[in-house]
A protein has these predicted regions:
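Short, positively charged and aromatic/hydrophobic N-terminal segments
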Residues: 3-11
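FMN-binding flavodoxin-like domain, especially the glycine-rich phosphate-binding loop
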Residues: 10-54, 59-234
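Iron-sulfur cluster-binding cysteine motifs and their immediate structural context
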Residues: 240-242
Length: 242
């Protein structure tokens, strides 16, 4: 598969979040979709880390169906564009962070927009969305970043989204995340919700997250494409970040 994730295993006090926050930096919208699906799963308290079948169709983020299908309150903090200082997220809430991967790392612009976020021992899910090549150290980087700001990373995941370089002529993970991806994300979130309710709220080591195997030929083709893309960018630049 091309989805990787970790869940918390340490036993502490049971926790039932009163509110689920999604905190996203998502220029193309793919990270926002994954974050919304995981957050909906967290609120449902069901499913399995490895079984997307437990999550049926996932409503689109922001729809009435999505809001009415879960009991928890939802707040989206979208930091894609410059905004005011975000609120401090309380310890009785849960936060779902999602950012895109750029060159195996979290995009510097994402870290800049997230730097003012603060928690109070708030459990956090850290998610990286990558263009089907590699997520590198982005997940571990994001986990360390939010931990420094008062959050406890209790789960981590990496999901595929359509690459920002994708075009009709050279599609890269075209149409991702698709319905199956969102079902996987919701199932993952549901398992996290269960673990929180069972008191498994200790921090995870996001560095243990392993990438799916990528055939060498696919890597070489991608590298060739990127080199060509960069040459074209020098001639006719296209802005990929807001």
């Amino acid at each position: 598969g091309d989805i990787s994730y970790l869940c918390a295993t340490h036993n502490m006090d049971p926790m039932n979040p009163t509110e689920v926050y999604t905190v996203v930096f998502s220029p193309t919208g793919t990270s926002r979709k994954i974050a919304a699906a995981v957050a909906q799963g967290v609120a449902r308290h069901g499913g399995s880390c490895n079984a997307a079948a437990n999550a049926a169709a996932v409503p689109d983020a922001g729809t009435n169906a999505a809001a009415s299908s879960v009991a928890k309150a939802f707040t989206t903090i979208d930091l894609t564009h410059a905004a005011g200082k975000p609120p401090v997220l309380p310890a009785d809430a849960a936060a779902v962070f999602a950012v895109p991967v750029y060159g195996g790392r979290v995009a510097p612009a994402a870290l800049e927009r997230l730097r003012e976020i603060r928690g109070e021992g708030t459990p956090a899910v850290v998610l990286a969305v990558y263009g089907n090549r590699a997520f590198g150290t982005a997940v571990a980087q994001l986990a360390a970043f939010v931990a420094e700001r008062g959050f406890v990373p209790v789960a981590a995941g990496a999901f595929v989204g359509e690459h920002s370089y994708s075009t009709p002529g050279t599609p890269i993970a075209e149409g991702r995340p698709d319905a199956q991806d969102l079902a996987e994300a919701a199932a993952f979130g549901a398992r996290i919700g269960q673990k929180l309710a069972h008191g498994e709220t200790g921090p995870i080591d996001a560095a243990k997250l392993r990438e799916p195997h990528t055939p060498l030929l696919s890597k070489l083709r991608f590298i060739r494409f990127v080199l060509g893309y960069r040459r074209r960018q020098k001639r006719t630049p296209a802005v990929l970040l807001p």
